[in-house]
Structure formats: structure tokens, C-alpha cells
């Protein structure tokens, strides 16, 4: 009965968010006053009045990682159109694993001590309100860019409008596309063809469900054993190249290897993030934000490592060794003045919108490159790249302020009991 209630809540929130999307004025009239009230707290763009204060540096690092994902996908375009490997910023896909670890840390910090007064329904409602409005926006943006592109699959096949609308509806309710299905409209096997990166949120949802039902109940010792077992599984996937991709960049489609690989890829860093949160004791580090940001850039910029096991070992080194240190340092540090606080809060606020809306514009960027007689050089593409990155940041901020925050506040008032 409880499960049925939760699913009813899920579809109600999804449906209401879709309705609100077409009627943004519903909550905008109160935005100015609510923003003034929110500004008096040390919380960023949360819709919940009882949210704990954020780790500001972790918010900032999440924003840095989101921007680095865009940079990685820019270079992915040159590799895709040029028919080669990603020569620059090859390991940018590891940002997703960093996101999963941050998520485990933050969710454990935010919710572990609330279960005496919070139900499963309350937890799932909060997570849906936090994540789903932007998922819907990402699907809408992806639909618009796909139509601008001419509704053309990668092989040049034209996709009927009806299938595009079905893909939009399924994405709004977060139902993944099966490879080869008519509603898998781009034709390259993506779980969410209108907005590819939504795959990571698919596994994030699974992680949230498993956290609420099982993982949170584990003792810290049991959680460490659980994490160690997952670490062995992840190392096997990475080092043995189970996917055949030459990397651990798995999870984006719904075949057997990608589903189980994506699940392990999410669960290990998520669980390790929980361990870090439970064991956390701050250390003193000067310049923590800049140190961690620089290390992320360096780690992601390492080129592909040739050799039977070398690249997989490097991925495991990053995920198992370096990322936990970065999370610990980031959680230990603090902003030193009002300006640095605003920078970290801004980066944290735009991180999710940037991540979830950027890839539809990457599709357009790839399409633009494919129309050229030959793959343009980076210098030739630089003006377009600059416009793309700046445009995504500006649009993400506008969507955050005019859509995401008002909608989340409205949904929180409706569904969250004070």
C-alpha cells in the first residue's frame, strides 16, 4: 500500500510540474518576496525551509565539474565528427562519478538523522521536487533543439513528429527508451534520446530509492563492507573493459552491460560518499576550493592511456583514491569572504541546470560540425564554442530563477508538511 502511495505521489508531482511548465505565472507573483526571505538564510536555492546549511565549497566544486562536463563534450564533438578518439580532456566523463560521490555525501548528511520524523513518502517527495522539474525542462529543451535540427537521426533518417512527442512524454515521466524502438528518436541507443545526460539521473533515482529502503539502515561497518564489494565490481568493469568502450563511460543506454555497469558505477561512489559523511571530521586546508578545482581539471585533462589495463586503473585511481580526498577537503574548507561565498553559491545553484540542459545544445554543435566539408579546427570552432558555453550558463541561470526555484517552492508548499 505504501509503495502504491509513493508511485501515486510520483505521477502527481510529474503531472503537476508539466502543467506548471506551461503556466509559469502561477508562482512568479510571489517570487520576489520569497527570494528576500530566502536570502536571510545560509541556504542556497533550496525549496525546503528545514534544509540544513550547505557545504558551500562542495556546491562550488559541483558547479566546476558541471562546467568541465561541457568542455569535455566540446572535445567529444571533435572526436565524433573527426572519427577519432577524444584527444583533449579525455577523462571528463569521470565528472559523473564525482557527482555520484557528492550525492552520497550530501544525502547522508542531509537525511540520515531525519528518519525518526520523516517517512519514505516524505523523502521521495523531497527528492522528486528537487530533481524532476529540471528533468522535464531538459526534455523540453532537447525536443526544441531536435526539431530545430530537423528531427534527423544520426544516420540521416527523418523522425516523424508523433514519435518525437512520444519521446518527450516518456522522458517527462522518466521512462527510458529501449534501443531500436521508434521513440528512441536519435537512433544511437540513448536511454533518453532527447537529452542524453538524463541517464545519470536515472541511476541517481535508483540510488535514492536504494538509500531510503536499504542502504541508510546499514551500520557504518556494514556500509564499508558493502562499499568494498561494490569497489571490486567497479574495478572489474573498469580494468577488464567489460563494456568494450575502452573506458568506464557506461550507463547511457539500457542494454544489459550498460544497466548493470551503470548501476555499479553509481552505487560505489554514492555509497563511498555516505561513508565519508558518516566518518567526516574536518581538517584545516587553505585554498581548498582552488586546490580541488585545479585537481579536477588536471585529472580530467589526462589523455587516454594506452595499454590493456592502464586506462581502467587510472579511472579506478581517480574514483577510489582522489575523489574521496577532494570531497573531504571540499567539505573541510570554507569560503573566506562574501565574494567567494557568492561565487560558490552561484556555481552550486547553476550546476544542475547547466548539466541537464547543456547537451541538447551539444547536439546542435555536433550537427553544425557535421555540415562542414571537413571537421573544423578548434580555432575555427572557437567562436561557436564560446557562444555555446556562455549561452548555456546564462540560460541555465534564467531557467533556475524563472522556472526551477518558483516551481520547487510551489510544489514544496503543496506536498511538504511543515
Describe these PLM feature segments.
Residues 58, 122-123, 131, 200, ...:
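Alpha-helical transmembrane segments and their helix-entry boundary regions
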Residues 40-57, 64-92, 109-121, 179-189, ...:
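Alpha-helical transmembrane segments in multi-pass integral membrane proteins
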Residues 100-110:
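Central hydrophobic cores of alpha-helical transmembrane segments in multi-pass inner-membrane proteins
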Residues 208-224, 228-229, 272:
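Hydrophobic, aromatic-rich transmembrane alpha-helices
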Residues 128:
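Active-site helix-to-loop segments that bind/position phosphate- or nucleotide-bearing substrates
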Residues 59, 63-66, 96, 103, ...:
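Residues within membrane-spanning alpha-helices of integral membrane proteins
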Residues 131-205, 233-251, 256, 318-331:
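Membrane-interface helix-loop-helix regions
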Residues 1-48, 413-418:
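Short, intrinsically disordered terminal tails adjacent to the first/last structured region
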Amino acid at each position: 500500500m505504501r509503495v502504491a502511495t509513493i508511485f501515486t505521489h510520483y505521477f502527481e508531482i510529474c503531472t503537476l510540474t508539466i502543467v506548471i511548465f506551461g503556466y509559469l505565472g502561477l508562482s512568479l507573483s510571489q517570487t520576489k518576496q520569497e527570494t528576500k526571505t530566502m536570502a536571510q538564510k545560509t541556504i542556497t536555492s533550496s525549496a525546503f525551509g528545514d534544509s540544513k546549511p550547505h557545504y558551500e565549497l562542495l556546491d562550488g566544486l559541483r558547479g566546476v565539474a558541471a562546467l568541465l562536463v561541457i568542455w569535455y563534450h566540446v572535445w567529444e564533438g571533435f572526436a565524433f565528427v573527426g572519427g577519432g578518439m577524444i584527444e583533449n580532456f579525455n577523462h571528463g566523463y569521470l565528472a559523473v562519478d564525482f557527482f555520484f560521490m557528492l550525492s552520497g555525501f550530501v544525502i547522508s548528511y542531509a537525511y540520515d538523522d531525519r528518519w525518526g520524523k520523516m517517512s519514505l513518502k516524505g523523502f521521495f517527495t523531497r527528492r522528486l521536487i528537487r530533481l524532476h522539474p529540471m528533468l522535464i525542462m531538459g526534455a523540453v529543451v532537447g525536443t526544441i533543439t531536435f526539431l530545430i535540427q530537423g528531427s534527423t537521426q544520426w544516420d540521416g533518417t527523418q523522425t516523424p513528429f508523433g514519435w518525437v512527442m512520444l519521446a518527450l512524454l516518456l522522458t517527462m515521466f522518466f521512462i527510458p527508451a529501449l534501443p531500436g524502438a521508434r521513440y528512441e528518436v536519435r537512433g544511437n541507443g540513448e536511454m533518453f534520446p532527447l537529452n542524453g545526460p538524463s541517464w545519470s539521473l536515472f541511476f541517481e533515482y535508483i540510488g535514492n530509492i536504494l538509500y531510503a529502503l536499504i542502504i541508510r539502515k546499514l551500520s557504518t561497518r556494514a556500509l564499508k563492507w558493502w562499499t568494498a564489494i561494490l569497489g571490486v565490481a567497479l574495478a572489474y568493469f573498469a580494468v577488464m573493459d567489460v563494456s568494450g568502450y575502452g573506458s568506464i563511460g557506461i550507463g547511457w543506454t539500457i542494454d544489459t552491460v550498460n544497466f548493470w555497469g551503470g548501476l555499479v558505477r553509481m552505487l560505489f561512489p554514492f555509497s563511498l560518499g555516505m561513508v565519508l559523511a558518516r566518518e567526516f571530521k574536518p581538517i584545516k586546508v587553505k585554498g581548498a576550493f582552488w586546490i580541488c578545482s585545479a585537481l579536477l581539471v588536471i585529472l580530467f585533462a589526462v589523455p587516454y592511456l594506452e595499454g590493456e589495463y592502464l586506462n581502467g586503473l587510472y579511472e579506478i585511481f581517480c574514483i577510489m583514491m582522489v575523489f574521496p580526498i577532494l570531497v573531504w577537503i571540499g567539505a573541510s574548507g570554507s569560503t573566506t569572504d562574501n565574494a567567494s561565498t557568492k561565487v560558490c553559491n552561484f556555481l552550486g545553484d547553476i550546476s544542475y541546470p547547466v548539466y541537464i540542459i547543456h547537451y541538447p545544445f551539444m547536439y546542435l554543435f555536433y550537427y553544425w560540425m557535421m555540415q562542414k566539408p571537413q571537421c573544423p579546427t578548434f580555432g575555427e570552432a572557437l567562436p561557436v564554442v564560446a557562444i555555446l558555453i556562455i549561452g548555456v550558463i546564462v540560460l541555465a541561470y534564467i531557467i533556475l530563477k524563472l522556472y526551477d526555484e518558483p516551481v520547487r517552492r510551489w510544489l514544496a508548499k503543496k506536498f511538504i508538511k511543515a
